[in-house]
């Protein structure tokens, strides 16, 4: 309709100009016609825009319903039982998995983490470290082998109970457009305000929260863009402390933060990991040195396993990776 309107106005102006030169019409009549043409096409353009928006909305709704109607890739077994009162011992037994069935990402991975141990996952980008975490969280099911927690195959327990035992702190923390208090409370929705504040203190987040304009009632922007990355990670640690899981999954941030914030994050993580089984995708040397075990993963296989010092002494793949 915009093109039609433009052409009509152009024709009117040309024809009107020709008629005006011959004193058949006045300039005022021509201007009136141009205004009438604009008024005629304006609602038509509005209808066309509304139709385009409606088509976009229908396409979006179709995609949403496709997601809602899709069968979940991982479903609870009919006789699945809750996972409760666990110590936190984790074992991968000859696990093989690929996001595509003919392209394995992990092959024959075997590892054992005793309750309370810290396991650092080390390896080059794309080696399979994140896949180990995804399988432990049961975002996918293994193709061969099994994963157990305290001897129970995680495919035999309910997903809700499994994930309630897992605390996850990732590099990028998603914060909701809500108060700081409720963002931390997301770790355990039934927690009281006092419990939320206590978790924030343990996470070294209380000091900067109290400096905010409304303290714990300060509104957070979508995705937490009004907080620094270090502050977002401290809030994520507070969430995990509040949830009180037996098993932790940590993906250390690679981006730089100021020295004070990094020290606070490290102190909070040490408190969080105390007495819990922890799997850490490690980037910091301090974390690697403090880990009970290092699992060196390359091309989907655990190729070396041991402590930082023992693997350096072996002068294998980890030694070369560390020196590089």
Residue ranges of model-derived segments:
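ABC-type nucleotide-binding domain
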Residues: 9, 74-77, 81-324
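Extended non-transmembrane interhelical loops and adjacent amphipathic helices
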Residues: 58-69, 312
């Amino acid at each position: 309709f915009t093109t039609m309107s433009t052409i009509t106005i152009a024709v009117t102006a040309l024809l009107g100009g020709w008629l005006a030169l011959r004193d058949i019409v006045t300039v005022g009549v021509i201007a009136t016609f141009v205004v009438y043409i604009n008024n005629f096409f304006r609602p038509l353009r509005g209808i066309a825009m509304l139709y385009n928006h409606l088509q976009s909305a229908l396409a979006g709704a179709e995609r949403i319903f496709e997601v809602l109607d899709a069968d979940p890739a991982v479903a609870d077994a009919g006789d699945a039982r809750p996972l409760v009162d666990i110590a936190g011992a984790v074992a991968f037994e000859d696990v093989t998995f690929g996001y595509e069935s003919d392209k394995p990402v992990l092959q024959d991975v075997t590892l054992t983490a005793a309750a309370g141990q810290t396991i650092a996952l080390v390896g080059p980008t794309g080696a399979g470290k994140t896949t180990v975490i995804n399988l432990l969280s049961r975002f996918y099911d293994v193709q061969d082998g099994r994963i157990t927690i305290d001897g129970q195959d995680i495919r035999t327990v309910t997903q809700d109970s499994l994930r309630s035992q897992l605390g996850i702190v990732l590099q990028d923390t998603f914060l909701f457009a809500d108060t700081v208090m409720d963002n931390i409370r997301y770790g355990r929705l039934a927690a009281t305000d006092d419990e939320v504040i206590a978790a924030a203190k343990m996470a070294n987040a209380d000091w900067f929260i109290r400096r905010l304009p409304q303290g714990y009632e300060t509104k957070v922007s979508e995705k937490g863009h009004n907080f620094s990355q270090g502050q977002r990670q401290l809030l994520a640690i507070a969430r995990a402390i509040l949830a009180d899981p037996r098993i932790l999954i940590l993906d250390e941030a690679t981006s730089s933060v100021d020295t004070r914030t990094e020290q606070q994050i490290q102190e909070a993580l040490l408190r969080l990991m105390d007495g819990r089984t922890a799997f850490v995708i490690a980037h910091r040397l301090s974390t690697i040195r403090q880990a009970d075990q290092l699992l060196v993963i390359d091309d989907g296989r655990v190729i070396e396993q041991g402590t930082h010092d023992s693997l350096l002494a072996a002068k294998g793949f980890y030694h070369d990776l560390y020196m590089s």
